[in-house]
């Protein structure tokens, strides 16, 4: 919630997303939420020396392409990767595709019923310029499907909020009927499914060496 508030109120040009690479599958979840928010970001895969010492392997370039954001192995305690991290930040800020070819905006597919609900809500949300200027309408629709109280309060005063909530509830009911899960769980499962698939495609494997902590 704090991160979301800062991103909305400060509207940074580029976000540096620091990821603890000791447990990528768990720690990439925030990255999927930043993708929903449609922010420009560069990811620091921090503590990368410890993953190497454990014998973990991953194609960082391929992972960057799949997430649509440059990912830079870093070790902040030694300064490793910091210069490259800031070079990527500048490249993303200046839209230099030749220097940061992996940067592109992607959508994570949450399943057809949820995606239909997102599209239907977006048709209404896009009518409000004050919302579009501060938020990704896709992000707002996803948060409504997660029954986020802050976003519900944001939407409630809108002229056609009843229609927006109706689309949300219809999509949630269809998800429940189809999968047996509530829409919040279905969204979380879809995100972790995306992360797992991306790591697999990037050749991620864990080593068999003992932890270095």
Regions of interest found by a model, annotated:
Residues 2-72:
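Conserved C-terminal guanine-recognition region of P-loop GTPase G domains, centered on the G4
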């Amino acid at each position: 919630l704090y991160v979301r508030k800062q991103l909305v109120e400060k509207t940074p040009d580029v976000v540096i997303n620091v990821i603890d690479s000791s447990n990528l599958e768990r720690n990439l979840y925030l990255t999927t939420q930043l993708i929903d928010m449609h922010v420009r970001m560069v990811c620091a895969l921090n503590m990368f020396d410890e993953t190497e010492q454990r014998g973990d392997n991953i194609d960082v370039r391929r992972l960057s392409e799949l997430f649509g954001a440059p990912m830079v192995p870093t070790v902040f305690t030694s300064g490793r990767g910091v210069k490259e991290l800031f070079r990527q930040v500048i490249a993303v800020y200046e839209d230099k595709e030749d220097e940061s070819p992996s940067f592109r905006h992607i959508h994570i597919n949450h399943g057809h019923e949820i995606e239909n609900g997102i599209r239907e809500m977006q048709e209404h949300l896009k009518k409000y310029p004050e919302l579009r200027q501060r938020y990704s309408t896709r992000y707002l629709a996803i948060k409504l499907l997660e029954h986020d109280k802050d976003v519900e309060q944001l939407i409630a005063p809108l002229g056609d909020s009843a229609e927006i909530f109706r689309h949300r509830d219809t999509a949630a009911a269809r998800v429940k009927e189809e999968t047996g899960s509530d829409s919040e769980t279905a969204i979380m499962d879809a995100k972790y499914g995306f992360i797992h698939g991306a790591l697999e495609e990037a050749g991620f494997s864990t080593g068999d060496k003992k932890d270095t902590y």
